[in-house]
Amino acid sequence: MLARCKSMFERDKNHPSIIIWSLGNESFGGENFRKMYRFFKDNDKSRIVHYEGIFHHRMYEDVSEIESQMYTRPWEIEEYAKNNPKKPHIMCEYTHSMGNSNGNLDAYYKLFRKYDVLQGGFVWDFKDQAILKKEGDISYLAYGGDFGDFPNDYDFSGNGLVFANGEVTPKFYEIKYWYADVLFEDVKEGLVKIKNDYLFNNLNRYDIFITTTKNGEFVDEKCVTIDLEPGQTYELEYDVVQKRYKGEEYIVTFTVKEKNETIYAPKGHEVKHHQVVLKPNTLKIEREENTNKVNINEEDKLITLSTEKVKVSLSKESGLLAQYIVNGENILKEESRPYFWRASTNNDRGFKNEVDAVTWRNPNMNLVNIKIENYINLVNLVVDIELDNNSTVTYVYSLDSNSKLKVQQILNPNRDLAKIPAISDMFILKEEFKNITYYGRGEIENYWDKYKSAKVGLYEDIVTEKMVNYLQPQENGAKTDVRYLEIKNEKGEGIKISGVPTFEFNISKYHPEDVEIADHFYKLKPLDATVLRIIYKQMGVGGDDSWRALPHPEYILNPNKIYTLTYEIKPI
């Protein structure tokens, strides 16, 4: 070991990029580490020495000048910071970037900036390791087991912020957001505090664009430059729209961009953004006066509510939405259904959620009762359903004379069950309904605990076979903080789904359970349909590690309370 240490030293001692000598990786302790440490200190007074192994073998505390740890939870590193630490704390590995991961970053970065002794960490890791393999006309990125090798580590080589082919993943942008050294803090409406957290850069090298939007539409924009030295703060005033009527949401977005071309990025490259919502979007618009009636038609198998613009039918066997007819066409290919699952992520598998929570994967349903409540200009269908895991679901479908269908899914879970992966309604739409417009966070995927990199805005997209190509297929592509979602065919016909006040959604050409069982995306067969999930919440993606750590408690759906998903559907 000492010979290797000496060889490394001679090879690298004149490289200015080398700032720390490391004694090894996950090798516990021993006298050889003391000898290596002594060699470096005798031969190089300019660099410090690091070794993570002392975390597990404290009798060799003296061989590292850094408290180096791996995958320590945020509350654990804060405990270290509070207890008179003798060494700076650096995680040589943290936020394990395997598959759809890197949630919870806010918890780490608030601590890094609160305690000087907490010096950050190194993401594991930068790039997936996989090998391009060809089988006939198909090329794909292969991992353990794809070459007939056994035993193997399966896809455990896929821990990167960048895919093996060099494509940047959505995780990369979340890391970028938290790494950026331009910090924003809301002081009050019209005033934001900016801190230059760089060590050397003056913020005058950047343009700061201040953009105002109304319900996602552009209103105005201005550009400012501030002269702010490293470590300093500045309070920046910005204009706000004074008259903001009910149903209007104004957002002010601050975007920090490179003023000039740099060695790493072109002119205009975005460094950081910050958004201020001036009015929360409740979407509780005043009802229009309407004397039209809601018609009720009860048949052997269906209960149908109708107005001049829409027909909504519930199955009398299941109590679920069987038809939603717009312009004479039923947009549904199958009955809607409550859905409490997601395609398991690497982290879900790591803490065995796909085993522990399997009772939430397609529980059998038993219709208990359907009650019709007929009011002036409004009809409610109240549906009670029992699940075979001893939980209950109540639906309240309310169609008013303005053709707005309000849906409430009320889940009363069995308190003895495992954590709930997701709370949602699933719709299998006809394939032609694939053009979407949404007002929410986008356009990259975002989740309950991984969303800061995604701006609230107005986005358009088309549902295709494309997905986020994680090395192993899993939950991907969700959007959060969604105010509304429009889904249309080529003729511009379809539906608008509005949150009360917001919802999450996932839309694709694949069923989550098909995604979950596939070991490579190329094996997935797209459906002749559009698969839509309207989601109350799904648990966070986590990422403190990928083998035991759950998402943080605030991002978990525990079965100890009643959950209500509410949204509204109108025809387009």
Feature annotation, model-predicted:
Residues 68, 252-282:
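Polar, glycine-rich mid-to-C-terminal structural blocks
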Residues 2, 191-198, 252-256, 309, ...:
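Buried hydrophobic-core signal for structured, non-transmembrane domains
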Residues 1-191, 197-204, 209-218:
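Extended substrate-binding grooves/exosites of carbohydrate-active enzymes
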Residues 125, 212-214, 258, 429, ...:
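Residue-level signal for short segments within beta-strands and strand-turn junctions
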Residues 24, 231, 261, 268-270, ...:
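Glycine-centered loop/turn motifs
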Residues 27-30, 57-60, 75-76, 97-99, ...:
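Flexible loop/turn segments at secondary-structure boundaries
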Residues 241-247, 262, 276-572:
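Beta-strand/loop-rich accessory regions of lumenal/periplasmic or secreted enzymes
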Residues 191-227, 235-238, 247-258:
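Beta-strand-rich binding/interaction modules
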